[in-house]
Amino acid sequence: MALTIHCNIVSAEQEIFSGLVELLVAAATEGDVGIGYGHAPFLSALKPGPVRVKKQSGDEEIFYVSGGYLEVQPESINVLADTALRADDMDEASAEAAKKEAEEALASQTGDGIDYSKAAARLAEAAAQLRTLQAIRKRAR
């Protein structure tokens, strides 16, 4: 049996996951990080994208976070997300529609930097949701 650490994944709205995990993999601003039992204390901002957890049972679960922070303490891992969803609850059609809408908004920009930045952020978030859904499909194969 592998060593485990307690993991919490929470959003501003609710707790999404709480339990013992062998490994958590997330997209930090410095690059992808893998956190397991015995990892050094660590704090990093998270990029939008998938967060994978390998549970104590050996099952793997994937979550989508729109950004936030990853905190590693000696006894726990905390993912503090702006928005967090179980990847199984995500809808590919709505993610595709959001991506298309953001691409159209970017194409129609006339120079207002604020609207451009918002559209670029929406596009990055939609693309991250689609990457998360693709990770689920790969796992199912």
Curated annotation (Swiss-Prot):
Keyword Cell inner membrane in annotation: yes
Kindly list the places in or outside the cell where this protein is found, as annotated in its UniProt entry. Cell inner membrane
The UniProt entry, under InterPro entries, shows: ATP_F1_dsu/esu_C_sf, ATP_synth_F1_dsu/esu, ATP_synth_F1_dsu/esu_N, ATP_synth_F1_esu_C, ATPsynth_dsu/esu_N
Position of the signal peptide: none
**Cellular component per GO?**
plasma membrane; proton-transporting ATP synthase complex
Q: Give the matching Pfam families.
A: ATP-synt_DE, ATP-synt_DE_N
Q: What is its main location?
A: membrane
Tell me the keywords, alphabetical order.
ATP synthesis, Cell inner membrane, Cell membrane, CF(1), Hydrogen ion transport, Ion transport, Membrane, Transport
Q: Name one GO molecular function term.
A: proton-transporting ATP synthase activity, rotational mechanism
**Oligomeric and partner information:** F-type ATPases have 2 components, CF(1) - the catalytic core - and CF(0) - the membrane proton channel. CF(1) has five subunits: alpha(3), beta(3), gamma(1), delta(1), epsilon(1). CF(0) has three main subunits: a, b and c.
What's this protein's family per the entry? Belongs to the ATPase epsilon chain family.
What function is annotated for this protein?
Answer: Produces ATP from ADP in the presence of a proton gradient across the membrane.
Protein name, per record: ATP synthase epsilon chain
Q: Which organism is it from?
A: Teredinibacter turnerae (strain ATCC 39867 / T7901)
